[in-house]
Amino acid sequence: MTNTRKSHPLIKIINESFIDLPTPSNISAWWNFGSLLGVCLILQILTGLFLAMHYTSDTATAFSSVTHICRDVNYGWIIRYAHANGASLFFICLFMHVGRGMYYGSHAFLETWNIGIVLLFTVMATAFMGYVLPWGQMSFWGATVITNLLSAIPYIGTDLVEWIWGGFSVDKATLTRFFAFHFILPFIISALAAVHLLFLHETGSNNPSGVSSDSDKIPFHPYFTIKDILGLLIALTTLMMLVLFSPDLLGDPDNYTPANPLNTPPHIKPEWYFLFAYAILRSIPNKLGGVLALVLSIMILAIVPLLHTSKQRSMMFRPLSQCLFWLLVADLLTLTWIGGQPVEHPFITIGQLASILYFSIILILMPIFGTIENQLLKW
């Protein structure tokens, strides 16, 4: 008789995805982040669900309801901070996951890569709307500034912004719809993640060497379930350290002041995980140009596979491209730092140089270095 997990219509799908899945034997810890992202998503949905039970999406009571969660709800503070800092863990895993894909040439799986980009945009949209919900100063002004960017779109811009706001400014209608979207999007993300996995399992996983591993595969369970659990324990320990010891480390003090449309904070800035894109936006003096650069800073990932000129898929044996990759990482860290600084000299210049370098590395230098490495292989 066949094992139930191999014959049952529903359990069979789980079995083929997480138990008997043939996996390259040499994948490193960089392949842990996919499962970590799944755990982050489940954690965010669960904590978010419990927060939604006590939250009110009304401008008059939103701030008070978040305070009520922290003060009066049993373990409300831990749920709230696990949710807020869980978003940071989510983005750390996302950036690592995308970086891994670029480094080891996983972008050759076009469908998986493109669904991944859609996922990245969706998660960013969800996080942005979630940041608006506590209705503090930075929530309100962040929402105002970022939604206002759409007014740069020619002809329809102003109408589009007012349509999103549901009025002539960020107000009750905006908060209510942002809550509705913030609630529904994680489920859409879950569906997209399932499609992401579906496409990945059509081709099988990539591996650090970048060559086919069909001749050397092992079952996912128990080998990689154990390996993923180690990564999970490290991630959850880090998250709980953050939540229990310094929950406000990554937040903005301005968000502990209730939203006031008559008082603008001195430095409006988003959460840390958007700062690199925010720095690119600010480095262009023109409004429409800045918005385009902001979108392109993420959309550029879509043309990474088209710019792959090297005969080798992975960067494992390409030292020149490795140097370039780590320069890109350093550049993104610089942009993140600049995004949190005030708009004044020398930060403006540093931001502009870092933005130029960001696009230059991906669009110009990486393809050139790939070609040079091809020539070096002939010698």
Swiss-Prot record:
Pfam families noted in UniProt: Cytochrom_B_C, Cytochrome_B
Cofactor(s) of this protein: heme b
SUPFAM superfamilies: a domain/subunit of cytochrome bc1 complex (Ubiquinol-cytochrome c reductase) (SSF81648), Transmembrane di-heme cytochromes (SSF81342)
Sequence positions that bind heme b b562: 83, 182
Keyword Repressor: no
Transmembrane segments: 33-53, 77-98, 113-133, 178-198, 226-246, 288-308, 320-340, 347-367
UniProt remark on cofactor binding: Binds 2 heme b groups non-covalently.
Binding annotation for a ubiquinone: 201
Amino acids binding heme b b566: 97, 196
PROSITE patterns, sorted: CYTB_CTER, CYTB_NTER
CDD domains in UniProt: cytochrome_b_C (cd00290), Cytochrome_b_N (cd00284)
Subcellular location: Mitochondrion inner membrane
Keywords per UniProt: Electron transport, Heme, Iron, Membrane, Metal-binding, Mitochondrion, Mitochondrion inner membrane, Respiratory chain, Transmembrane, Transmembrane helix, Transport, Ubiquinone
Similarity comment text for this entry: Belongs to the cytochrome b family.
Functional description taken from the UniProt entry: Component of the ubiquinol-cytochrome c reductase complex (complex III or cytochrome b-c1 complex) that is part of the mitochondrial respiratory chain. The b-c1 complex mediates electron transfer from ubiquinol to cytochrome c. Contributes to the generation of a proton gradient across the mitochondrial membrane that is then used for ATP synthesis.
Note: Heme 1 (or BL or b562) is low-potential and absorbs at about 562 nm, and heme 2 (or BH or b566) is high-potential and absorbs at about 566 nm.
Assembly with partners or alone: The cytochrome bc1 complex contains 11 subunits: 3 respiratory subunits (MT-CYB, CYC1 and UQCRFS1), 2 core proteins (UQCRC1 and UQCRC2) and 6 low-molecular weight proteins (UQCRH/QCR6, UQCRB/QCR7, UQCRQ/QCR8, UQCR10/QCR9, UQCR11/QCR10 and a cleavage product of UQCRFS1). This cytochrome bc1 complex then forms a dimer.
Protein name: Cytochrome b
Source organism (scientific name): Suricata suricatta
Gene: MT-CYB
